[in-house]
């Protein structure tokens, strides 16, 4: 019984950190939650509440930056710019609803990209972005100028929403390659629609976009899961060791009893 109690105690001790970590939020996770709440307020057209949350975010962000310095220079710049745009959206008396939501979404995705080590939220826009682009590509192949312009504008609007977040998670080299293709297509729209050879840029951009999202999908598992894996493995090993020890102890006791019987 004594050994069984020791085993139970060890298992509880090993599981406790997992339970605590599941309920405690890091300062950056708190910022992530605030950004999400601000987005929800703007979606519900509660602009004053959204503005208050953005002000609160700014206070917390400054406090964390001064105390812990968890952000790189690029991250600080990207967060600051996207926060300023979000605050302008919340405070504006005349900005269109869609523009407000777009700016808050951009801000929300930036904070998530910094707070999340794998599969950031911006990758969830994969289907929307690829669909808009493929519609533009199809319009170009049929020579439909009006629909090409419309769909390519939709694609660029969606791409601009995730662009700051991409700069946090994606290498500068990959972003520059995609930017170069987009800028060429945007500048020479008429040529892309009317010239089959120029449409090869559309093929190249489509491939780059697919690779971008596929590489993010293949991201490694959350490092925090390693604690669960290691702890679970340790518990299994500990349990098997205890069972083995009990079996050995039982066999040892049986040998002692047999020895006593023979002596008697």
Language-model features: where?
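C-terminal amphipathic alpha-helix
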Residues: 27, 31-38, 42-47, 96-118, ...
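Long amphipathic alpha-helical segments with strong coiled-coil/leucine-zipper propensity
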Residues: 67-126
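Short, solvent-exposed, charged loop/turn and helix-capping segments
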Residues: 60-77, 96, 159-176
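Membrane-proximal low-complexity regions enriched in glycine and acidic/polar residues
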Residues: 101-172
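Solenoid-repeat scaffolds in large eukaryotic assemblies
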Residues: 47-57, 98-100, 148, 155, ...
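C-terminal single-pass membrane-anchor helix
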Residues: 1-2, 6-15, 214-264
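Extracytoplasmic/lumenal ectodomains and periplasmic regions of secretory and membrane proteins
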Residues: 145-206
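N-terminal pre-first-transmembrane soluble regions of secretory-pathway and organelle membrane proteins
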Residues: 1-86
């Amino acid at each position: 019984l004594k050994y069984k109690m020791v085993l139970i105690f060890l298992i509880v001790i090993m599981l406790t950190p997992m339970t605590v970590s599941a309920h405690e939020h890091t300062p950056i996770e708190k910022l992530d939650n605030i950004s999400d709440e601000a987005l929800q307020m703007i979606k519900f057209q509660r602009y004053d509440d959204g503005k208050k949350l953005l002000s609160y975010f700014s206070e917390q962000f400054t406090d964390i930056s001064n105390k812990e310095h968890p952000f790189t220079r690029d991250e600080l710049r990207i967060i600051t710019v996207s926060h300023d745009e979000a605050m302008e959206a919340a405070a504006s008396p005349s900005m269109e609803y869609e523009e407000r939501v777009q700016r808050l979404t951009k801000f929300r995705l930036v904070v998530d990209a910094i707070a999340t080590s794998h599969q950031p939220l911006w990758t969830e826009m994969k289907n929307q972005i690829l669909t808009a682009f493929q519609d533009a590509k199809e319009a170009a192949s049929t020579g439909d100028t009006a629909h090409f312009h419309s769909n390519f504008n939709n694609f660029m609007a969606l791409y601009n929403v995730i662009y700051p977040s991409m700069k946090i998670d994606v290498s500068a080299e990959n972003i520059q390659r995609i930017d170069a293709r987009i800028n060429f297509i945007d500048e020479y729209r008429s040529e892309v629609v009317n010239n089959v050879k120029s449409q090869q840029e559309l093929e190249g951009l489509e491939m780059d976009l697919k690779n971008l999202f596929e590489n993010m999908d293949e991201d490694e598992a959350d490092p925090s899961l390693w604690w669960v894996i290691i702890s679970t493995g340790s518990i299994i090993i500990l349990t098997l060791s205890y069972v083995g020890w009990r079996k050995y102890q039982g066999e040892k006791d049986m040998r002692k009893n047999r020895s006593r019987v023979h002596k008697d």
